[in-house]
Amino acid sequence: MLKVLIPTIMLFPTIWLTSPKWLWTTTTAHSLLIASISLMWFKWTSETGWTSSNTYLATDPLSTPLLVLTCWLLPLMILASQNHINPEPISRQRLYITLLASLQTFLIMAFGATEIIMFYIMFEATLIPTLIIITRWGNQTERLNAGTYFLFYTLAGSLPLLVALLLLQQSTGTLSMLVLQYSQPLQLNSWGHMIWWAACLIAFLVKMPLYGVHLWLPKAHVEAPVAGSMVLAAVLLKLGGYGMMRMMVMLDPLSKELAYPFIILALWGIIMTGSICLRQTDLKSLIAYSSVSHMGLVAGGILIQTPWGFSGAIILMIAHGLVSSALFCLANTAYERTHSRTMILARGLQIIFPLTAVWWFIANLANLALPPLPNLMGELMIITTLFNWSPWTILLTGLGTLITAGYSLYMFLMSQRGPTPNHITGLQPFHTREHLLMTLHLIPVILLVTKPELMWGWCY
């Protein structure tokens, strides 16, 4: 664990002491090294339990894929941000990269924590850098409103969780995940216990976000700079799913009945947010709502609490993290050239950027779950689980997948096909940096098809 954590912490002096000329090169190289070292976690010494462990930090089959995704994303965020942060003063550039690196440190400690209180503290600590990135480097003044929404939604959900955790500590005497899995299941039957159950899960459902408490997400995504959108879509939403899976172990007797309304809400949300996507004119807003739709499926898979549901949820979280991050990068490259996120003003780009149209095509097909890709594997596992629970859910999930295909193709056709407007014919060509960025996003998605056990979690 420390093999990754110590180099990540050493990024901070590197960022502040490197000469301005080499700042971006050094940080990108350093973070790529960290990402390659993190791949070692995939080599589990024991197939089932915790590995790389000390008293407070450990990895297991559930957290490993998410940890590697976190480390993989930092060099990509630094690569994506170069163009629009470069004109700023050097101290601000350093601060920006410092915030990204601190976010990675918090996330590694959140996914690696074995103590639930430590997970909670890191879960909350990720708010601070994200909030600064959104409110300081966002595009329009609306970013302050988005930051407020983001902060208050997440904090309002998290405070009951803290109280619930303290109550759990009082009743079981420990909050270590290593011990809790062997402790006696709690006898939960009163109203107070039901409120306690809700308090444990609401924080994660807000973070995912579940339809109904998702209003902060489109605002935050649309206003954030590209690195903010990438880390929000790829890793921060996954904190919610990860936390739910960890808490479900302790909430076992109650969860069977109380989860029903949340499952229905998640499935209804897939259709509702998908329908909202079909009406969007703003490119980033469309990708943000599609994230809500996918995470609704993940929430359903986790709340069912079967091995297939958990596996499907992890697979879909990893695949969605890479793909939606890639889509935000593509949206940003178009925005940097046309200075507009409105799809009608920047259409027909395929004629000008043919290779980029290929990236758009692959990313969109991955988003709508094309057969060999892991997105489909995750969706099929979750849909099968839900169908086993109640055959009626096939109506909702089937309609949801249909709408997903619809808005993905709509996004591709609106941005790439059609006549090219006269005002965007003189755009600068794509850089190698951007092609590298897309390669590093989409190659892992394609490679995961060949060895999907890496993200099957406990089932494997």
Swiss-Prot record:
One of its GO terms (biological process) is electron transport coupled proton transport. It catalyses: a ubiquinone + NADH + 5 H(+)(in) = a ubiquinol + NAD(+) + 4 H(+)(out). GO terms for molecular function: NADH dehydrogenase (ubiquinone) activity; ubiquinone binding. The lineage of its organism: Eukaryota, Metazoa, Chordata, Craniata, Vertebrata. It is a multi-pass membrane protein. Keywords: Electron transport, Membrane, Mitochondrion, NAD, Respiratory chain, Translocase, Transmembrane, Transmembrane helix, Transport, Ubiquinone. It comes from the Eukaryota. This is NADH-ubiquinone oxidoreductase chain 4. Belongs to the complex I subunit 4 family. InterPro entries: NADH4_N, NADH_Q_OxRdtase_chainM/4, NADH_UbQ_OxRdtase, ND/Mrp_TM. It comes from Carassius auratus (Goldfish). It is an enzyme of class 7 (translocase). One of its GO terms (cellular component) is mitochondrial membrane. The keyword Ion transport does not apply. Core subunit of the mitochondrial membrane respiratory chain NADH dehydrogenase (Complex I) that is believed to belong to the minimal assembly required for catalysis. Complex I functions in the transfer of electrons from NADH to the respiratory chain. The immediate electron acceptor for the enzyme is believed to be ubiquinone.
